[in-house]
A protein has these predicted regions:
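Acidic, divalent-metal-binding catalytic cores of TOPRIM
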Residues: 1-184
């Protein structure tokens, strides 16, 4: 299509990529009207967050979409990194939140994405630190201990609250992965 009159009229410069500008303007409102995709490390996170949003913010629940993990999508922090890179590479335009656990694997995986040039519609974050995890019982090769597990062992279950995490008034300890009590 001839746009000479638009260039002559000052609406565009000769070097402007008019078709790219037009496409950007057309899709500009699309992401704001589409669901926000929430990506998590596993099915439990998605199920809990979906149910929590529906319970606490029912008027907002239709604004979010979760990865359908029933289709055998792999879980874990490493898999989430691959999914985020795939979304970026495929040009998925929905606003997307990649939510990692607040543990060692989650922080390590999220840091891998810091050097990746992600589009502005994708944000990467971890669950926040919580006061309950500042002094939490753990079980591992050095025996039972009480320490901060913020940043090292906070999966979504630690955000359920003290009442859910206790048995007979005692917090259920975090068992360090790979630790087998039988090998003491």
């Amino acid at each position: 299509q001839d746009i000479t009159d638009l260039v002559s009229g000052g609406y565009y410069n000769e070097i402007d990529k008019v078709s790219e500008i037009a496409l950007e303007e057309l899709k500009g409102d699309y992401p704001t009207n589409s669901r926000i995709i929430l990506l998590t490390e596993g099915p439990t996170d998605s199920e809990v967050l979906r149910a929590s949003i529906k319970l606490l913010y029912p008027h907002l629940s239709d604004y979010y979409s979760f990865m359908d993990l029933a289709v055998q999508a792999p879980g874990g922090a490493g898999s989430l990194v691959h999914v985020v890179k795939s979304f970026a590479g495929a040009g998925i335009e929905n606003r997307t939140i990649a939510l990692f656990d607040n543990d060692t694997a989650g922080h390590s995986a999220a840091s891998l994405l810091r050097d990746v040039r992600l589009p502005s519609n994708i944000i990467v974050m971890t669950y926040p630190d919580i006061s309950l995890a500042n002094s939490y019982p753990t079980r591992g090769p050095n025996g039972d201990n009480v320490q901060s597990v913020n940043g090292t062992a906070c999966s979504i279950e630690l955000y359920f609250g003290r009442d859910v995490l206790t048995i007979d008034g005692t917090l259920v300890p975090v068992q360090w992965k790979g630790y087998d009590e039988r090998l003491k």
